[in-house]
Amino acid sequence: MSQKRTDEPAPTKAAPSEVGTVLAQRYEVVRELGRGGMGVVYLCKDVGTGDRVALKRLRIPEDKAETRDEESFWFHQEARAVASLDHPAIVRARDFGQLADGTPYLVMDVLPGRSVHEWMHTTKMAWSVIWALVEQVLAGLGHAHARGVIHGDLKPSNVMLDLASPKGPRAYILDLGLAWLRHPHHDSRLDGAPAPEGSMHSGAGTVGWVAPEQIRRAAALVGPSTDLYALGCIMYRVLVGREVFEGSAQDVLRAHKRTPVPALELPAEVPVGVSGFVQKLLAKKPWHRFEYAADARRAWEAFRPKDQPTFEEAMAMTPRFSPRVAPASSRPALGHVIASGRSLAPGLLGLRQAPLVAREPERAELWQAVREVAVSVPGTDVSRRMIAMIGEAGVGKSRLAEWLYEQVHEQGIMVPLRARYGRIATPLDGVTGAVNNFFGLEGADRTQVEQTLIQRWEVDPKDDGALTWVAATAEWLRPTPPGTTSPLGPSGKRFVVDTPELRWVVIQKVLEHVGHDRPVFLWFDDLHLSSPNTFEMLARLRRATSKLRILAVATARSEALATDLDAALRMEAM
């Protein structure tokens, strides 16, 4: 973790030998924009288009050569993160590749304005500017989180603010160098490559702007609310004029873990309720913050200054979800809003997700199902919807389901889960894998599973019933091998899941915990490869009388069903 107390490198001039150099046979160096311990950023001219661009290259000092592999990994991670995003409030990637000496580089748009770090040291921001800044950062974070990207190092120097835009204040999130990819787009089942393990950068976060779970290196707890904590730190500094905690690096880290947040002394023009909003962002436990950026954004709406347009209104985009808005198919793709006239180099083609084009009738029908389940009464038929998309490989079934997955997440409408199936079954197939991913438990042992669930569910040590459910969930997620006795974990309980009925009861209870007060979106990818037990579970979900609201969307290949009568009959029955 970075121990420096400042996070804004002063702009410097490039060395004389670098000015005029053409990198990657395309980008002519104009000057240096800044540098850090492991990289340098240049202002360049794209000789192919004439555009001004920012080129970031990895540069490892000789005395830190042993970190080259790790830093190279995180540089590629940043490229993958930026390439997967397409939002007006996030810096846009244009190219990625390797220079002649083998070091990786990433080319991005040059952004107007100055960093929030510079603004807050030179200007007192008006309340209307602060409101727009927070709203737009929340919009960008919601987009990133829905695509599995956690920034991990949000701070004033990583947010640009343009006050000269004709559309009003514009904020941009940049520098995803420590981005955490929660569910990479690459499917290791396609080429046999091992799935990348979740890991935290050895320097994750910057002192003063880092969440308690990052300080504790509690990887399972890192998620959307981690970035929201960092945003709370930024808001505190902008509103109050000082950081949340001050002192030595160690004192600040210790305070972020344990010390209550000092009261906010707000300027007179700031609504009183903003103090509680910031306090919620800065809660020590992630599950006490807003669960999604969209939740925070809806709460932030209450403080909007009079006549202040929302981000979508300013950008001529369709408003966010409500039960009465038009279906998503009528909204312009974000790429159409920000990509006009820009040229992308082929280096990003292997990293960028294919855009979803057309398919308006299908998207409208899917969105209608989302709306119906979202406003339904628990326990009614409409609160449990199931949709199957069947077609040949390559027609876009999974991309359509993924689009819906991202939309319900970005707008905070449902809790999205993805259950995947392969020809060779693995322990993380299906709903088991989806729940493991949701709780960040893919690499956790049984003890860690129980510890995480006890934390997340805030189980009272004296509550035998809740502890039993923890043990039952751990047994479902980490089954005891036949002929052995399940270990006694932190719950102090043992639970045997030995019948389909009991297994279903556990699954239903877990899904209720996952959904809490909102519906669950459950995507079954390649359902034709699943076992009969999965179809039985779906049938039980359809008949369930619990408070669970769920939209299940399944994709299956028609050519596979044509040669597998049993699977075809199960799909037909569903």
Question: What does each model-found stretch correspond to?
Answer:
Residues 45, 135, 160, 208-312:
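C-terminal lobe helix-coil module of Hanks-type protein kinase domains
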Residues 101-115, 119:
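Conserved short submotifs of the Hanks-type protein kinase catalytic core
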Residues 59-84:
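AlphaC helix of the eukaryotic protein kinase fold
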Residues 84, 133-134:
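Hydrophobic/aromatic scaffold residues of ePK-like serine/threonine protein kinase catalytic domains
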Residues 138-149:
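Protein kinase catalytic-loop region centered on the HRD/HxD motif
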Residues 96:
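Activation-segment/catalytic-loop signature of the eukaryotic protein kinase fold
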Residues 40:
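Conserved N-lobe ATP-binding subsite of Hanks-type protein kinase domains
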Residues 153, 175, 270, 290-574:
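Key residue(s) within conserved catalytic/signature motifs
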